[in-house]
A protein has these predicted regions:
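Membrane-embedded translocation segments of transport machinery
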Residues: 2-138
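Juxtamembrane/interfacial segments flanking transmembrane helices
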Residues: 16-18, 144-147, 182-183
């Protein structure tokens, strides 16, 4: 979180913060269609890990006396705050570099490295940013394979073997997506629909 705040300060100071802020917060309600609402709902479900079994995983580790509504509100609030901070970091840097804001992997892996390369100490901030992205991806993937691990354990398979096996399958899918955009597109479509 501290690194996000440092990157936010850098973005405010060195990015085109006014354009980035306007891009994020000036709504064009003429573009609010049924499809746009469905895309927004899909994004919300994805970022909150709803429908993927992770709710079950995190719920199983909650103390019995925890307030579920309070936990839900805290997660939704913190997720929204982190997303807003990330947007306030990313888009001012994109606009300061004269790049077009995109979305998804194109923004993350194509546009942002160009933005970071044009910055003073961009290699340091870019490395820090992508380390944060890697940590977020790893922590999400751990919770995503837990339902499969629990199911395999019920069939009598050793937890360590189940974890390593599912982790290897996920890793192979990730490696395959590096070498073929068709694999990535198929995985993206399967997980988003």
């Amino acid at each position: 979180f501290v690194l996000l705040l440092v990157l936010l300060g850098y973005s405010i100071r060195n990015g085109n913060f006014e354009l980035g802020f306007d891009f994020l917060f000036n709504a064009d309600f003429s573009k609010l269609t049924g499809d746009a609402i469905l895309i927004a709902m899909g994004h919300a479900f994805f970022t909150l890990s709803l429908g993927m079994g992770t709710v079950m995983v995190y719920g199983s580790y909650m103390p019995k006396n925890s307030s579920i509504p309070r936990a839900v509100l805290a997660v939704a609030f913190l997720d929204t705050i982190i997303a807003l901070i990330a947007g306030l970091i990313i888009f001012p840097l994109v606009f300061a570099s004269g790049l077009e804001p995109g979305s998804g992997p194109g923004l993350l892996f194509e546009t942002l490295p160009i933005a970071f390369s044009g910055m003073w100490n961009g290699s340091i901030f870019g490395t820090a940013f992508f380390i944060l992205v890697s940590i977020a991806a790893l922590s999400s993937s751990i919770s995503l394979i837990e339902p499969g691990i629990a199911w395999l354990e019920k069939t009598g398979i050793n937890r360590l073997f189940a974890t390593c096996g599912l982790g290897l399958i996920c890793w192979l899918g990730g490696v395959a997506s590096i070498y073929s955009s068709a694999v990535f597109d198929t995985l993206d479509y399967a997980t988003a629909n």
